[in-house]
Structure formats: structure tokens, C-alpha cells
UniProtKB/Swiss-Prot annotation:
This is Protein SlyX homolog. Belongs to the SlyX family. HAMAP family: SlyX. Coiled coil: none annotated. It comes from the Bacteria. Pfam families: SlyX (PF04102). Disulfide bonds: none annotated.
Length: 70
């Protein structure tokens, strides 16, 4: 009987440890979710800002003729 009690105690300790680990991981997931949400909002704002920028009057480098030494 003593062996069974010992095994049950070990299982209870492992379960308690796992519960603690799961709670820590859950808190990390919540924090990361907040970080991702913030980054998505920042990306959305940057995209809106980029789309509202007027195009430049300068020609793109691909449209420019190469310098005479080429």
C-alpha cells in the first residue's frame, strides 16, 4: 500500500507542476497576443500612411538613362 501512496503523491506533484507551467505558458500567450495585436495596428497605420503619400515627381531608377560612362 505504501508504494501506491508514494506513486499517487508523485503524480499529484507532477500534476501541480504541470498546472503551474500551463498557467505560466497561458500568461505568455496572452502577452504575445497583445504584442501581435499592437504590431498589426501599427502596420495598418503605416500602410494607410504609405498609401496616402503622394507619388514623387522623380523618375524611378529603372526609368533613368545610365550615365555616359556605361
Amino acid at each position: 500500500m505504501d508504494n501506491i501512496e508514494h506513486r499517487v503523491e508523485e503524480l499529484e506533484m507532477k500534476l501541480a507542476f504541470q498546472d503551474g507551467t500551463i498557467e505560466e505558458l497561458n500568461q505568455q500567450v496572452i502577452k504575445l497576443n497583445d504584442v501581435v495585436a499592437l504590431q498589426q495596428e501599427q502596420l495598418r497605420l503605416l500602410l494607410n500612411k504609405l498609401q496616402s503619400v503622394e507619388p514623387s515627381n522623380m523618375a524611378s531608377q529603372a526609368d533613368e538613362t545610365p550615365p555616359p560612362h556605361y
